[in-house]
Amino acid sequence: MYGGDEYATNSEYYDDYAHTGDPQLDMEYERNYYAARMPDNVKYFLINFCQAIKEGNLYDIQNMYENTFPQISDHHFDKTAWPEEQEVAAIVDNDKVFLILYKELYYRHIHARIPGGPKLEQRINSFFNYCDFFNLIISAQNPVMLELPDIWLWELVDEFVYQFQNFAQYRARLTEKSQDEIQQLCVNHSNEWSILCILNVLHSLVDISNIKKQLEAISQGVDPQTVAGDFGKLSFYKMLGYFSLVGLLRVHSLLGDYYQAIKVLEPIEIHKKSAYSHIPACQISTSYYVGFAYMMMRRYADAIRTFSDILLYIQRTKQLYSTRSYQNDQINKQAEQMYHLLAICLVLHPQCIDESIQQVLREKNYHDAMFKMQCGDLEVFKSFFVFACPRFVSPCPPAVDAPMDDYVKDPMEHQLLVFMDEVRQQKDLPTTRSYLKLYTTLPLTKLASFIDPNASEDDVSKLLIRLLCFKHKMRNLVWSKGPSGLEGTFKSGSELDFYIDDDMIHIADTKVSHRYGDFFVRKILKFNDLNRKLKNINI
């Protein structure tokens, strides 16, 4: 992209006596000094990057952001930080906006690449840099004329939430800190990366962009520009507002508030494609957190639909992000987590899913684990949940006088406890279902003897409770239409239904027969495509 050499090894030492007292000459001296220390391709990249942002050249900005910056990072700064602000400021004429954006990338790189992670000072400085950026665009009387590619805006909001999550986990690890560090963290830096700051920023971006009104207008067939306002008319503010809704979904999910997580997305029709869902990483992240929230709310049918739809999308659009290794790794990991969550949901709430998703579950041996879960193996449920769940955080830091301990796992263990309590209530239901599927009528006493050959009258009474539990757990709230993901109608998700008359269970099989047409059409098309490729091979 840019040709250049490594850092000069024999750069002149910085000479305070070279300062003349003339601000212009001193700035020229600093520019030359820092430029001499910096590889040429890094220097040219920063100058061109700054110029592209000044001019609002989206094509060049996106190319440098997505391609050149990662390439230079790999070549020069694989496990080290990029040049500090003062070094960059000297060669970009102290451009305020560019320096804020550069520092966002600078601290993001430190979080991702530096062994051991960022220091406390770097975490705090990153927070204040985000404050500078958001104050610049939110507090302005008139819209800031800044053009950035949508992928950068998404990753900026996503990174903002990630660094909040990372700081909350760092703050909870008391065993790795001295008493002075704990005191400094809890007293001097109690407001930095606080949950109130994070929510305030995200809600402010949503409000200033009028994104909710715009989404409502679109759903009603009205031109969104009529309700967008001066700020929301600009793509920069509109997309930041949209991505902030997804950021709020993630924050509330990390806190374990699943109702509010779905609630903040009400203007977005979750199960429909929109013009705003053109960033694959954003769409995948949205579906992951929505599906997980549905699962924890015991809305398994909605969770299965959410996971199935996005996993099909990932299968069909891999080429969109496969060239970007960092995105590929992240998306592959999230896809693997969603397969684990889908397996859990299918065990707790069996239903038909797309054949291609079933094929992946078979190829990756999920069926063995699913069989163990159906047999009541709680350890498999636990391991799947721990692998696939978000890394939960506590909104509050540990108390200053709290015992020296690692509090990072407390939020996750609490969510695991809630989930496993639900699983324990359902672990006997697959056995009950398997017996009911064999009959159209079945006496209560006979079913009780199947479950326990030495069943007593008390066991028959307990069986009624189990059957009532089966009825209750198989009736879920299922979304059907409307912008709110919280709405829906109660439906039975089981492939069989029953009622009890005196001591007799009457069973009806409501299973819908498989439609094999789509499956064979896909296989025929795949075979024809393969046949064409074989014919084009020259032997």
UniProtKB/Swiss-Prot annotation:
Recorded coiled-coil stretches: none
Subcellular location as annotated: Cytoplasm
GO biological process: formation of cytoplasmic translation initiation complex
Main localization of the protein described in the UniProt heading: cytoplasm
CC annotations in GO: eukaryotic 43S preinitiation complex; eukaryotic 48S preinitiation complex; eukaryotic translation initiation factor 3 complex
Keyword Protein biosynthesis attributed: yes
InterPro entries per record: eIF3l, PCI_dom, TPR-like_helical_dom_sf
Disulfide partners: none
Pfam family, one: Paf67
Keyword terms of this UniProt record: Cytoplasm, Initiation factor, Protein biosynthesis
MF (Gene Ontology): translation initiation factor activity
Domain called PCI: residue spans: 306-514
SUPFAM superfamilies recorded: TPR-like
Signal peptide bounds: none
Family of the protein in this entry: Belongs to the eIF-3 subunit L family.
Subunit structure: Component of the eukaryotic translation initiation factor 3 (eIF-3) complex. The eIF-3 complex interacts with pix.
Role this protein plays: Component of the eukaryotic translation initiation factor 3 (eIF-3) complex, which is involved in protein synthesis of a specialized repertoire of mRNAs and, together with other initiation factors, stimulates binding of mRNA and methionyl-tRNAi to the 40S ribosome. The eIF-3 complex specifically targets and initiates translation of a subset of mRNAs involved in cell proliferation.
Name of the protein this chain belongs to: Eukaryotic translation initiation factor 3 subunit L
Organism in which the protein naturally occurs: Drosophila sechellia (Fruit fly)
Lineage: Eukaryota, Metazoa, Ecdysozoa, Arthropoda, Hexapoda
